[in-house]
């Protein structure tokens, strides 16, 4: 395991008119790609730096240098807009999660509450999306014991932040993610777009609309 954040790559082989074609799927967290952490949130002005970072990491992984235009125009197959909400007033993430878990989502979603050993996450599952609410600091504490217990992947990169954040007590970090999985789901979520590429979707208003 590298001591830095790297994208996950999957090569898909398909056949078109009897000929094989290959498509590289690239999965990554945009803030982790730039900052090794998703406590910091990106703005539209970060796009150029993000594409440059992605270009360099892909070169490191596969030995091929994709152009920045290729990366900017890459089709989006999965999209996870998210938001960190910081509480400094003794508001407890657990209280918020308990309230959310009591809401009636049944008319729209199937609600499933998943408890991990020393913390909680609420998942709202639908046919075309997945919504996750969780206590980010509790999730990091779980990752410190075992990454398998944590909801976030690659949490080991952020473990050093736990001690730093303790200085800001009573800090609580509530994370909210909406996960559109599959290109059809992304298109349904943003029907106003003509194309669903990395560049066209990296917009604040689109992320806010998804949340």
Where are the predicted features?
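Structured, helix-rich domain cores that form ligand/interaction pockets
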Residues: 1-211
């Amino acid at each position: 395991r590298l001591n830095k954040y790297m994208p996950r790559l999957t090569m898909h082989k398909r056949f078109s008119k009897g000929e094989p074609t290959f498509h590289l799927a690239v999965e990554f967290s945009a803030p982790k790609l730039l900052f090794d952490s998703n406590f910091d949130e990106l703005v539209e002005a970060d796009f150029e730096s993000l594409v440059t970072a992605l270009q360099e990491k892909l070169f490191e992984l596969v030995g091929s240098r994709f152009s920045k235009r290729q990366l900017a125009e890459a089709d989006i197959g999965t999209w996870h807009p998210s938001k960190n909400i910081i509480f400094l007033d003794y508001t407890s993430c657990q209280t918020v999660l308990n309230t959310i878990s009591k809401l009636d989502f049944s008319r729209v979603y199937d609600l499933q509450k998943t408890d991990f050993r020393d913390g909680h996450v609420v998942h709202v599952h639908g046919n075309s999306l997945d919504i996750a609410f969780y206590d980010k600091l509790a999730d990091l504490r779980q990752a410190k014991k075992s990454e398998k217990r944590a909801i976030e992947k690659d949490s080991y990169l952020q473990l050093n932040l736990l001690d730093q954040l303790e200085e800001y007590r009573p800090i609580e970090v509530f994370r909210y993610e909406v996960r559109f999985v599959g290109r059809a789901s992304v298109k349904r979520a943003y029907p106003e777009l003509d194309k669903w590429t990395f560049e066209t979707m990296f917009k604040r208003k689109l992320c806010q609309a998804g949340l």
